[in-house]
Structure formats: structure tokens, C-alpha cells
Amino acid sequence: MPIQILAARLANQIAAGEVVERPASVVKELIENSLDAGATKIEIDIEKGGAKCIRVKDNGAGVCQEQLTLALSRHATSKISHLDDLEAIVSLGFRGEALASVSSVSRLTFTSKPADQEQAWQAIAEGRDMQVTIQPAAHPQGTTVEVLDLFFNTPARRRFLKTEKTEFQHIDELIRRIALSRFEITFVLKHNHKIVHQYRATQTQSQQEKRLASICSESFVSSALYFQNSDNALKISGWVSDKLSARSSNDVQYCYINGRVIRDKLINHAIKQVYAYSLPQGKFPAYVIYIECDPDQVDVNVHPSKHEVRFHQARWVHDFIVSTLTVTLNESPLSASEPQSQPKPSEHAYLPANRGEEKTDSQYEPKEKNKSAGRVNEQTAAPSSGYAKRETNPQLDQAKMAAYCDFVAEAHLPFSADEQQSSTLSDLTFATVVCLIDRQYLLIKLNAKQQLLNIDSPFLVLSLENVDLMIKQMELFAAWSDGEVIAQPLLLPVRVELDALLLKTSEDFNELFMRLGFVFKIQGSKLIISKVPALLRQAPVAKIIPELLTFLSQTDNNMDAQQVNLFCVFLVNTLKQQQAENINWTEQSAKALFDLLLSLFSEKLSDWQKQLFRVPDLSLLVQGFSHE
């Protein structure tokens, strides 16, 4: 058969196979056109599940008489005009295929009136010959598109339609998804001339929650955690369910990018990673997530349905979602989400948000740890090493801490320890946090019974950076000592080229790495790392691994606890050196870190005084008033 150009009718019907899958596909395309036209009210009237009639009416900008015929032509659109426009698409539609594809498999009537046009006009097209007839009509400002007898000229496609009830359920779900993305727009859905749903435009937060409840259920709204976060040009907000609100189906999972309904594998993977070990088998999280980014950072021209997107910085987006949702779930006390069957600990302690549940048996196989959840009202940006309130076994923590302090007392710590007067620090449980200094230090006021011996000052300055490093060392050592591994999978495995000596070292110390949360394999001359400890999740793993192996190559294979502790010190110090900048602590995270320090270290604080605390010289402040 010779090569030939397809007839317009045949080409449009082929395109319709991609664009028009079922009646819900038609409704989606028509509503997106209405939204792009600036409509504030959209009415959707369905008959017989959409097989008989689909009518979408809006009060948008409308189409002038001269462009009605062009509007039904293939590859005709007002939304893009140049190739560069594809790099920054802001409209929902842009292909110019929808109306032509729909009219090729139905009897379509397009009626429209712009505000500056006195008369409304109507375009009529049928799938048989694709000829468009223009005639005057009566219509208010806006557009009405009526699609009759869908697939009337393609019997095979019509036979594949499901029952009327099933097809309408798909349309109903579509309207729900779109209504959650545009709270400022009124949607009215009718089926067989009866109003099924009416979502009125919302102006206040309470009205938004009312629409959210009508779509996602009252139970979701009552237990959902609201969050919002931003990182440069990337913003994320929405609602997520806590652990107790897990559902038996994934029917409440909505995600939007720049107002577009999407089902993206990258985002699904990020959300699953957050909830992976927080939910029981067969349970699903519920969420409504809104992501906003620069249009040139996301490619929506991936699939005709436009449900799939491609991010230019996929790793950044993935990790931003994971960190934001993890902090959200960890912001509230675990008591709001612990199963009732579990015994309640007698005391509260603070643990890093990345810590997992305590284990009594020793297991070397790394696995991701549980995430705590609870009710929060708002989330702000927090350091990557944020801390959250947790309930733990205080006896177990004290036992770990005592053993850890005994080993670390003789270790060569990476902290500066300027010579100053020797003194002893008593219990700081009732000390008062005064303020945060330069987002790096915490000013603490002691009461009369908590003074430093031989030092006449009621104030201390705490180095948050040093406390953070010290606690990370404790976390690593605890993971090694009792098999409580904190491992997180990398989005993409990291490949590191190593020489023969370092490859041999990685084999010799494989058990140590596993107990600390590393998972890797050797492939030729490369080490392929798939999981790392939680504290290395955002670190440059490819730079850190060779340094760790170089350190281990100079030690004995049979490492005792003292040597393992020194390795943990070296690992944390290396991590600090590889960080581009210091953490900017917030008052909330700094206070949580201080409380964590007290709960874990208790009477051992005097052993760490030179590394953690400094006594401010108040005489310098006094001299400032003397004008000398």
C-alpha cells in the first residue's frame, strides 16, 4: 500500500482514540476549556451516563463568531503560538485537539457569546463529514458545548462503554477532583436532569473545609493535618491523613500541580515512602496535595490526557515532598496516633524525627523505620534534622546513654574546646530558654540552684550545631549496639568508583555498614549504594563513602565498641564538613533539640560542658555602657 495522507475525518477519529476514551474524557476537556476561558461558574448536565448527552455551560470569555469554525478545527488553539510556549505552559489545555476529536465521534453543538458581541452564534458539526454550520442563537455571555450520541459513528467504541452508572461515576469523580483544585469556582453537576452535586464558590477557610468535607468526607477533615511549605520556587500545601485515619481504599488521594489534576509516579513514590512503615498492610493514606512551581520546571506535554508530568529536577521535588510530609506527621505528639493496644510509656522524651520505634531484638537487615503522626494546624520550614516530640521507653534510653557516654568520654571529638575554668554543670531540667541567637545558638538562664560552680553567671550559651552532631553520633552508635537500623532508600542508587583497596575494605566491613543502615553491592570497580542512614539522606554520599572507607582501611577488621564509636564520630564530622552551610534553626526546633538534650543526657551533661556550653562574658556588655 502506498504512503498517503489520511483524510481529516479519519485522522480526527484516530486522535479521538487518545483524547476521548469515555464520556468522562469529554467532560474533562470541556471543563478545562471553560477554566482556561476564565469561567467562575460551570454547569455540567449529563444524560444516560454521557452516552446520550453531555452539556457543559460556563460564563467565561466566549468565542467570537469569526473563530467558531476555527475552534472546531484540529490543532487550532488560542493558548500557545510558538515552540517556546511549550516550555512554560500555564493553561490546562494547549494541544488544540479536543473539540475536533470530540466532534469527529459525536454530534456537537458549540454556542458562544463574548462580552463585546451583541449576538450569540452557534456552530454545529457531526462526525460524518466534519462540515461546520454557523447560525445565530440566543445565549448569555459564555459558552455552551453540547455533545450528543457519543461514538454514534464508531459502534465498536460504543460497545466498550460500561453501564450508565459506571460511566457517571467516572464523571462524578472527575468533577470532585477538579472542584478540589478550584475553590473559587462554582460547579453544578446534573444527571438525567437532577442535581447531584453543587459546589459553591468559597471565600473563607471554613468554606473550603466544607467543600473538602463534602468531597473527601467529614472524617478526613476532622483528622487531616494541614501543611504548607516552600523552597525557592517550589511550594507545597494541602491536607494529609494521620496514621489512625488510614483508609481501606485509595479513594481519597488527590494531587495537583499548578492547578492541574495529575497522577504522577514520582509523587506517588514519595508519598508511599513517607507512609511505608506507618500504616498496616492493606491500608492507604488519604491526602489532598497542591504543588506550585515555575511552569518551565515541569513538562506537561507528556501524554494526551495530561495526567502525567515530568519534572526537570525530579530528585529535588521528590525529596522536598518526603521531607515536608515527614515533618508534618512528626509535628504532633505520638499519643494522638498510637494504637490503643500498646502500653503508654511513663515519661516523655524527645527523639529526632527520623528515629524509628524501639526494638528489643537485634536485627542486621536494614529497613525503613516508623514515622509518627498527629494533628497539626500549620507547618513552617524546618531544618532537615528537625526534632519532634515522641514517647519512648526512658529506661532503655538512659541505658543506651550511659553506655554511649562511657565510650565517647575518651573519644577525640571534632568540637573545639577552648580552655576555661573547670566546673561542673548540674541538672538543667528547669532551666529557662531565653532566646535564639543568630539561628545557631541558644541563650539559657539558670536558676539559683543550677549555677556553674566557680562561675558567677546565670546564663549559658548552647551551641546547637554541636548538640546536633553529638546526638547524631549517639544515634549511630545506638544503631550499631542494638541493631536498631535507621535506613532510607535513595531515589536513585549512587555509584562510586573505588580502587581495589577500598572495595576490599567495603567487603571486610560490610556487617558494620549494614548495622549502621547502609545497603550496597559491588559491581566491577563500583560500589552501588541503595540505602543509607537517615542522617545521610540529603548528604553527598558519593563524596562521603570514599572517606569512610579510607578511615576503615586503617583499622582492624574486628572493631570493638570503642573503635565503632570513633568511626561514628568520624562519620558525623565528615558529614558536617560536606555540608554546604549550617542549619538555620527556628525557635521551635531549637527548643525541641534542647529538650532532647536534657531527656537523653541528664546527669552526663557535665562531661560535655566544654563542647556544648559557653559562659557569656557579661562584663563586655557592661563596658559598652561606659563609653570607654
From Swiss-Prot:
GO terms for cellular component: mismatch repair complex. Residues 333-390 are annotated as: Disordered. Residues 355-371 have a biased composition (Basic and acidic residues). Disulfide bonds: none annotated. It comes from the Bacteria. CDD domains: HATPase_MutL-MLH-PMS-like, MutL_Trans_MutL. One of its GO terms (biological process) is mismatch repair. Residues 333-344 have a biased composition (Polar residues). InterPro entries: DNA_mismatch_repair_CS, DNA_mismatch_repair_MutL, DNA_mismatch_S5_2-like, HATPase_C_sf, MutL/Mlh/PMS, MutL/Mlh/Pms-like, MutL_C, MutL_C_dimsub. Keywords: DNA damage, DNA repair. This is DNA mismatch repair protein MutL. It comes from Psychromonas ingrahamii (strain DSM 17664 / CCUG 51855 / 37). The lineage of its organism: Bacteria, Pseudomonadati, Pseudomonadota, Gammaproteobacteria, Alteromonadales.
